[in-house]
Amino acid sequence: MGLSLLAGCDNEKQQIFKEAEKDLEQGSYEYALDEFTTSVNNGVKPAVSYRGIGICQLRLGNYDDAITAFTSALGEEKVNKSMARDLYLYRATARLQAGYLDDAMADCQVLAQNYEMDADAWFLTGKVALEMDGYDEAASDFEQAYGEDSSYDRAIQIYETYLNKDMEADGTRYLEAVLSTEAK
């Protein structure tokens, strides 16, 4: 009897975790945050639960709390290489949003040294570099990002990043490039 009660308890804990994932996917960040926090307290997939907390906090604009959650997730034992890469991307994003530019760049450097860089990683690194007034590094990183993903959405992202720094001319060439390839 005691064993069946424990099994029921575990099922309930797993159900809370599954609800958290569903709520996160649907954009119900407050609900997901509560459920992921409960999952951490219940010991259910701590690394994934901390990641969920971090994403919720990031979406809610609570950047310091997001950074703490991503750092906690990185400190967990069961973090594979793919998840660690994902966590560094999220933490760098939260650090950038919070204005911790040196820390954001440190995460970007960890990504570049230890993980496969894709368009998202290059774009984020360029965005951090531009915020730090590293114009040449940003230009190089954006070139890499656009080389990996020359979509209209990526061109708009790069353009808007330059526009936000009053450097519209630097971003316009990405729009021109994507429009010229779509016109063919």
Task: Name the predicted role of every residue range.
Residues 13-14, 47-48, 81-85, 119-120, ...:
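Helix-start (N-cap) detector for alpha-helical repeat units in TPR-like alpha-solenoids
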Residues 21, 55, 93, 127, ...:
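Residue-level recognition of tetratricopeptide repeat
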Residues 52, 86, 90, 124, ...:
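Canonical tetratricopeptide repeat
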Residues 55-58, 72-114, 120:
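Alpha-helical adaptor scaffolds
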Residues 149-184:
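Terminal, low-structured helical/coil segments at or just beyond the last alpha-helical repeat
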